[in-house]
Amino acid sequence: MPTINQLVRKERKKIIEKSKSPALKNCPQRRGVCTRVYTTTPKKPNSALRKVAKVRLTSGFEVISYIGGEGHNLQEHSIVLVRGGRVKDLPGVKYHIVRGALDTAGVAKRTVSRSKYGAKRPKK
């Protein structure tokens, strides 16, 4: 514990919070253009072909974003909406593509958690 004299000489340092999604520049989402759409494999205990896209954002950053849900219609030059949120088993993937916004279609035949995948309510 410092003395009052020590605090007068040198004040306490503020803890600077580091953003987990710096490419969004403090915005909730950002628009971007897909430069490459491909699949990649996850880290050690898991095994799959995860769908990801390299996206050039309006903020100037080029980021790797995860495409959630079953099936997608994205290709190069698709305009997408990107939100934050990392994928734990894919190193370097710190963003998600929002389904059902801009050029991204919602997930077809989705009945639960529909709002997360841009799916409309099914007809009775």
From Swiss-Prot:
Q: Which Pfam families match?
A: Ribosom_S12_S23
Output the Gene3D superfamilies linked to this UniProt entry.
Answer: Nucleic acid-binding proteins
Q: Does the keyword tRNA-binding apply?
A: yes
GO CC annotation terms, alphabetical:
small ribosomal subunit
Q: Which GO terms describe its biological process?
A: translation
Q: Which PROSITE patterns match?
A: RIBOSOMAL_S12 (PS00055)
**Record-level Gene Ontology MF annotations:** rRNA binding; structural constituent of ribosome; tRNA binding
Asked whether the UniProt record includes Hydrolase among its keywords, one would answer no
Which UniProt keywords are given for this protein, alphabetically ordered?
A: Methylation, Ribonucleoprotein, Ribosomal protein, RNA-binding, rRNA-binding, tRNA-binding
- The highest taxon in the source lineage is Bacteria
Q: Which residues carry this modification: 3-methylthioaspartic acid?
A: 89
Q: What does this protein do?
A: With S4 and S5 plays an important role in translational accuracy.
Give the family from UniProt: Belongs to the universal ribosomal protein uS12 family.
Give the quaternary structure. Part of the 30S ribosomal subunit. Contacts proteins S8 and S17. May interact with IF1 in the 30S initiation complex.
Q: What is this protein called?
A: Small ribosomal subunit protein uS12
To which species is this protein native? Campylobacter hominis (strain ATCC BAA-381 / DSM 21671 / CCUG 45161 / LMG 19568 / NCTC 13146 / CH001A)
Give the source lineage, highest ranks first.
Bacteria, Pseudomonadati, Campylobacterota, Epsilonproteobacteria, Campylobacterales
Name the encoding gene, please: rpsL
